[in-house]
Amino acid sequence: MANTYLLEVGVEEMPAHVVTPSIKQLHERVAKYLKEQRITFDDIQEFATPRRMALLIHGLSDKQPDIDESVKGPAKKIAQDADGNWTKAAIGFTRGQGASVEDIEFKEVKGVEYVFVEKHIAGKTVAEVLQGLPAVITSMTFPTLMKWGYNNLQFIRPIRWLVSLLNDEVVPFNILDVEAGRETQGHRFLGHPVEIAKADDYEETLNNDFVIADQTKRKNLIKDQITKIINENNWQVDWDEDLLEEVNNLVEWPTAFAGSFDEKYLALPDPVLITSMKDNQRFFCVRDGDGNLLSHFISVRNGNTDYLDNVIKGNERVLVPRLEDAQFFYQEDQKLTIDEYVERLKKVSFHDKISSMYDKMQRVAVIANVLGKQLNLSDEELADLDRAAHIYKFDLTTQMVGEFAELQGIMGEIYAKLFGEKDDVATAIREHYMPISAEGELPQTKIGAVLAIADKLDSIMSFFAVDMIPSGSNDPYALRRQAFGIVRIIADRGWHLPLLSIQSEIAPAFENAEINVSFDLNKNSDEVRSFFLDRIKQLFHGQKVRHDIIDAATDTRQNDIANILEAIQTIDDHKDDDNFKEDIEALTRVLRIAKKDKRPVSELVVDPNLFENPSEAKMHTAVSELIKENQQTVSENFAALRTLTPIISEYFDENMIMDKNEDIRNNRLAQLSILAHQASLIGNLDNLIVK
């Protein structure tokens, strides 16, 4: 028969951010355990609140399947002596299998006879298997762990109760001194201890005791309650999914309500108001029909509507000091100038092994100028970029950012506009942090994008220069994310920047700007190059591009990230062409033979007087034309190279490359090396797998 099993782990209240990952982890571990134990099931339903993680497993089999196996033992010549008596080896083997020598059979394996015992292993009942779950539960990992009592067990929070029900029967086990049973706990304040009659009654039983255990149903209820409030008041709400998820994991019985605050606080910038309400109080902001913030908020309590007026007043009361602080910071911050804030950055450390934040800005200003000129920015754009680069961290020393660190960059833009900076300069101050995650929004302005690249590039080069290079999962300064951000910006903009060799250009620029750097920015340049190539691979692995295509295009002498990105995309776009295999095989044959020529390409000269066959002249003309036309894009270069396939085939048919005559041999190698050099702009095509 199909069985239903309920497992509930009751704990002291977990932090909201670990509730969802924890139930997902428990689900995965229990499912893996059951599969390893050969127990089948239909599906697993998840339940989670701040005080519990629960799984309802449907369609469990009654027991493990029995196993009949033939167990191989020692060879016959070892199992029996010369007189045919059983040896200790045979007796020991059968004893270990729970059998006797009378059960022995001989079977031939590759011409040698071996002892075999047919063994029947009866499957355990599902209840017996489920008694092994304590080891699964206690093996869970969490960002932070707690100990309690006089034991060594560590868990996210102390375990206070366990429910283990197979249909309507308790499956007994314990974790420390907590015995599994059928008693669960209702809502902390509205509920009470309650027994669950059978596993399928779990959700309804808790619902009757003021606990909505299903996360999705609880979240939908919160959304419905908030929607009702905003519809009644003709408001709009900022549906912040992260905030909704957090609130959902803070409550077991949600009740949404609206509160208000003094309209004078609406004079604060929207991001300040939103942060004060969202991050500190977990309030949802509301707006009028035109999108303007209103002096109201929506919150969610963990309880019912009893004494709701008192709850509303309490929430309104605790918000006032937050808004008062924000108003004070906002007013005080405007009493100083940007230059005064910049001066304070001399006492703010970027990193104690590298420099102050002020010195970082000086470096970034130089890097930004180098990048801006390479991108042919106008004089006005270069001036705006230079101004932004010299002040873009100033808000770090304001009181507002000191209190609300998440507003860095945002307050920089707001204050910069208040102090009269140009809009492009102010926007760049905010955008230089972008993207703030792997999928985060990219800078929308040209100045912001260049500043974002310059800032991240300085961080990467600086940390590499002092040998603080990410390894394994260790990346405390998020250098991988910053490098990935640079790659994404370049991909988005299509900018051609020789970033993989930029270090050699920056050091002289520092000297010209009379900026002293206490470390060698050229140090570990090869590692920096590899670091960026790995981020390019990461980008295209995420897009499910074939590994061999990525490996081919990143095994290159290119320094221009945009060209490498284009090479990957170009090869991927044409991989299914009818003649793709033929073209790649022709080019890779050229690449392989050209490796025998150790001379620098810059020194190679092809002498037409040494040609013996028409195909040599034809190859020479075709390659010369290809170089002369100097295709502007990687895709154009690749297309031009592919037109050479019949010429290459004819060339190899007519010519012995490694001719006995040294001059002829070197001339032919020179021809192939020059062509190989052109092909290497695409990448190492030899890495491609063609079928």
Swiss-Prot record:
A GO cellular-component term linked to this record = cytosol
Q: Does the keyword Protein biosynthesis apply?
A: yes
- Protein localization: Cytoplasm
Output the superkingdom of the source species.
Bacteria
Catalytic activity reported: tRNA(Gly) + glycine + ATP = glycyl-tRNA(Gly) + AMP + diphosphate
The protein's enzyme class: ligase
- HAMAP family, from UniProt? Gly_tRNA_synth_beta
Of which family is this protein a member? Belongs to the class-II aminoacyl-tRNA synthetase family.
What does the subunit section of this Swiss-Prot or TrEMBL entry state?
Answer: Tetramer of two alpha and two beta subunits.
Q: What is this protein called?
A: Glycine--tRNA ligase beta subunit
